[in-house]
Amino acid sequence: MIETNSQPDWRDNGVRVVRADNLDTNTPQTPGMNRAAAINYARVGAQKLWAGTVTIHPNAKTGAHHHGALESVIYVLRGRARMRWGNQLEYVAEAGPGDFIYVPPYVPHQEINASTQEPLEC
């Protein structure tokens, strides 16, 4: 084992706080959705994680897609999320306020607002 006397530069390479009023809305958008990035490689150097906010309009859904090598975590604030996943989107689960959804790398999936009346906020 090689020992070094240098300490990590925790000031510039430690904990990062991304303020709610400093999200990046210059992200790929899907009709019926509003996305804003908080945590990604460009903003904080995250290697395999994307985190941000998503609002899905009533009765809207994404097309089938995956996020490549990135892991995604979704926290439902308001509304009802319906997730479909698999090669044919054959699996389905729902999540509500306070629930977390984990999407592993390369998993084909679709996000759906299960409500025809209320927006889904994640």
Where are these regions (language model features)?
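General detector of folded, globular domains
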Residues: 31, 36-40, 48-51, 90-97, ...
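Residue-level recognition of the GNAT/N-acetyltransferase active site
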Residues: 57, 86, 104, 114
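A short hydrophobic beta-strand segment most commonly corresponding to one strand
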Residues: 53-54, 73, 102, 117-122
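Conserved short histidine dyad/triad with adjacent acidic residue
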Residues: 34-40, 52-68, 105
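A short, N-terminal "cap"/entry segment at the start of jelly-roll beta-barrel domains
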Residues: 1-48, 63
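Ligand-binding loop in jelly-roll beta-barrel domains
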Residues: 94-97, 105-122
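A short beta-strand-loop-beta hairpin characteristic of the jelly-roll/cupin
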Residues: 61, 67-97, 107
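Short strand-connecting beta-turns/loops that link adjacent beta-strands
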Residues: 43-44, 69, 88, 116-117
